[in-house]
A protein has these predicted regions:
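A polyanion-binding, active-site-adjacent surface
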Residues: 1-146, 150-151, 157-158
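Short, flexible loop segments at boundaries between secondary-structure elements
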Residues: 148-179
């Protein structure tokens, strides 16, 4: 995994921000990502989203994870909160490796934007590498179209129930428990 992180750190993906290379805290984000990838090295499922959010992985270094989830302080991120909660409820946390088809952040430090086709194409190689030996599920249409993987509805904008149902449909060993409300 170290070579993947080294290549990711060196990557220039369109007009995205490579927060593993640039800015205060880049070394900490790389360290966190390395620890996360090691901890999930045997996860049979790869859940791939579109791109890091400005309040999520851009700050924490871990896909679908906010700084608040790691440290108890800092910004929370709605999608990260929902994804982590649903994975916990379904007993899938350790079974899933989270990633984004564009692993660097499109947008500014205060906003997100959709990645361009070129950015998706350039970032996909990292998802392809992590997909080896794993079942791949795509969160959202951009990831599904890029990877040709089964689509799961993104949990934002009222999609929590459909996101949850998609995980139960495709994930091995998921269990249905009482849903939470957002």
């Amino acid at each position: 995994m170290r070579s993947l992180i080294d290549r990711l750190t060196a990557a220039h993906i369109g007009r995205t921000t490579n927060f593993y290379r640039d800015g205060a805290g880049a070394a900490l984000r790389r360290e966190r990502l390395a620890a996360y990838l090691e901890a999930r090295s045997e996860a049979p499922l790869l859940l791939v989203g579109e791109a890091p959010g400005y309040r999520g992985a851009r700050v924490s270094g871990i896909p679908f994870t906010s700084e608040r989830q790691l440290t108890g302080s800092g910004p929370a991120e709605a999608t990260a909160t929902i994804v982590q909660r649903v994975l916990t409820e379904l007993g899938l946390t350790d079974q899933v490796l989270l990633w984004n088809v564009v692993p660097t952040h499109p947008g500014t430090d205060r906003s997100n934007r959709a990645p361009t086709r070129a950015e998706v194409a350039a970032g996909r190689r990292f998802a392809d590498e992590l997909a080896r030996g794993r079942r791949v599920l795509a969160v959202g249409r951009i990831a599904a179209n890029a990877l040709g993987a089964p689509y799961i509805r993104h949990p934002s904008h009222g999609g929590v129930a459909e996101f949850r149902e998609g995980l139960l449909r495709f994930a091995p060993g998921g269990r249905s428990v009482r849903p939470f409300s957002v």
